[in-house]
């Protein structure tokens, strides 16, 4: 599965971008923390589209400036209205509250629990510890760490390979591009690619180019 991040700053632009992106990818990620004047009604629109709903906290590299309680309520609203996936941080104290709410209302939303390190890739045992903690909370574990070397790439791929079908793992940065290309073969449920000029993280590959590469190595 190829996921294309939507990083526009208005609801109208985001919906237009998503329609275009789904011509190339299988799913989109709505970065709702980047939007101006987000409402629950807007979330209902986004939840109807095959997507990951992400409202990234500012303490995890995101742009959310309002209260955390409002952020959690918006994520619950996405669950209530049938979003395919939501993404919540491992460090978010209320992540289990979202899982409990999902279970109570019988929603089919899958919950991705995520971890980010924008400077380095931790050692394998640390990454495994992160993934195990995430899987005790949600349905899918995700980590995105900055890859500074080929060794970091190998660490990421090795951990991916231990959790096929239950993980999304990404090496950010130039050397991490290999994880975006090989991730699907090593067990990641999806890989991220960008529309031209709209990257949400360092090292993201243009979706057209990524599809060409994936076709070559199939």
UniProtKB/Swiss-Prot annotation:
PANTHER family: 3-DEHYDROQUINATE DEHYDRATASE (PTHR43699:SF1). Belongs to the type-I 3-dehydroquinase family. 3-dehydroquinate binds at residues 29-31, 56, 180, 200, 204. Pfam families: DHquinase_I. InterPro entries: 3-dehydroquinate_DH_AS, Aldolase_TIM, DHquinase_I, Type-I_3-dehydroquinase. It comes from Methanococcus vannielii (strain ATCC 35089 / DSM 1224 / JCM 13029 / OCM 148 / SB). One of its GO terms (biological process) is aromatic amino acid family biosynthetic process. Pathway: Metabolic intermediate biosynthesis; chorismate biosynthesis; chorismate from D-erythrose 4-phosphate and phosphoenolpyruvate: step 3/7. This is 3-dehydroquinate dehydratase. PROSITE patterns: DEHYDROQUINASE_I (PS01028). The active site is at 116 (proton donor/acceptor), 142 (schiff-base intermediate with substrate). It catalyses: 3-dehydroquinate = 3-dehydroshikimate + H2O. Homodimer. HAMAP family: AroD (MF_00214). GO terms for molecular function: 3-dehydroquinate dehydratase activity.
